[in-house]
């Protein structure tokens, strides 16, 4: 265990060293930079804890609100947890790409407020979707026959309904960029041509809605949390725009 911990610690310091030396990262606005650092630290903390048999996702991930392991603070902590390297990489890459633009446009306080509130909103929408699933499919049962686990109690099953990740907030960030800079051109792999940001956002939202409604077997992605982040982002941006116009100023 000692050698494993030492290796993880070395990898962590190497990664943070590379990140801190990366010129664009050094020039990044404070809130965006610190959000990425916090997410990376929590991710490596999760890996270290796993080596000691501790599942941080069980404490910091967002449980279904009727589960015994639910804690209201999880509506905040869950957005700093990630389920794997690709999960955190793509989320933080999006924050790295679009976060600085929004922070420079809005200022650090408004950007941080937007980030956290949309993450909470995404979690609330996910909770609502899970509640509908519970009412329509689970509430009449006391046990569940789950593949790979056998027959388990309903409380055990509800505690397994855990959401982690900043994806809801990331989708809100994409929405904000599309609303503030709708005609900016973006190159999206694998498309060989650029598309306007507004079409990019609409396309992503449509894909998430389709995937959420399809509810394919084995799909563990919280699609409605992504849409929830976008919904709360839309409401907040429209509110800010209306408030700015009422104050005699124009808000982009």
Feature locations, PLM:
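A detector for small-residue-rich transmembrane helices and their helix-helix packing motifs
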Residues: 2-252
